[in-house]
């Protein structure tokens, strides 16, 4: 009985008082101290006084500024980037930016502009990017040309522009991007294009304009970085109009809501009279698909046929020896051999991602592509009981292989023997059935990145990763370990070169203290979304200077002796843990406040206990863990009772001895 009473009294003695320190958040969100701020959608009618004069990047969209003038932003003379999207601006007055010499980007997207003064853009010495998208402009004469000599990109999409005839003396010498997408442009004249002749390597965007005619010779001898005519109904008109031009990238794809014509061999005749490196024909339909369709494609280096409703490429295609990149995503091949890869012997990049049918890898379908370096077969319902040497035969230079999001794959010993130069292998969300006791990856000595997330791995196989001598990045997210624990002897012991290890969502309950020994090169460890407690941090003691993510675990209390382990890390995330904000955790809370510069996710690092502090940020909590006045009173009473008890005990003992003499 006496011990119980003593414990009760001691519990009362060591009582704690809790205090929450709150701070009012600034109206604008600070992204980088004294430089970058977001003031979007706050109903502001002026620049708030809380914004420092040193602000350089300001996102001020979705507020209310019907007119802007030279006093609107006069205080913020260091502005470099200004976003005024959808601020209901109607008027841009004279010299609005006259004191903003460093300003290089102005975003006026979504403002119903009525008037822009001729000198409204004067002031910035290096204005490079101007966004006038969705501003109701119907003529390019509306744009003030003064002080646009250094302009590199002009965005005029989603307006009512019907002619691209630029104003006289419009400076184009430094122009790199001119965006006219989703306007009402139907005809392009030689005069329109000649006005752009000073611009070199220009990117022109006409997506969403139904171009019905191009004046013959308009693009003659012109050189472009890229041209986009997406959504045009008649590609023959486009290609004939581009004769004798040189284009690095030509985008001729269409969209879901566009009712375009089927493409035939005749459609591409104009392509024979121009020099193009890359063409995109996504979502088109082909009529009479045959080798002759590709007659004018011989100079291409890149071809994108995404979602082109293809069931196969015709055999016998000739002259495409220059093609380096082929994109066949979202088509309907039954077998990989149906792409007739032998027609493209110089391919280095091949994408057959998101095939709409179950794709059979076949055997030796790609063996003629001995120069292939990058292969993406993800999201294609691929299933193979014995992968992958026969399927990837004669691909000795392959460096990147993506087989993620497929059906179960059976991996034999040295499953990637045909691809010894692999540097990145992605098998995420593909159930792997490792048949051999040895590693299926053991010949991949150059592999640097391996994604095995959600692969239903047998993590008890300590040999699984053997042979990966240069592995830097390993993702095993979503796999499970026996009894929810990483033991002393585990599959990571054979990959001492690891720098990044992802172990999130693995249902981990504990980690052995020796689990990460030998991983001295580690710089990033993600243990988030598990069920680890504070005691599991003993396993982290060998790791120093790492990014450590412990978010969304079951950490309540972090013992005092583990704080040095946390202190030796560079960045730590402890958000979304049920942290105890009582005196039993006082050492950690004190450490936390002293190391805020190391902590990530502090807004979501909150108390779970006691109930009065639930949801309060850890950095806002103050604990007084000394004795209160009530505690002192009980201490005096306890000591007094203890003395009386001691006196009576001594007196009783002496009387007992006296009676037994």
Protein language model regions, located:
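Extracellular leucine-rich repeat
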Residues: 2-661
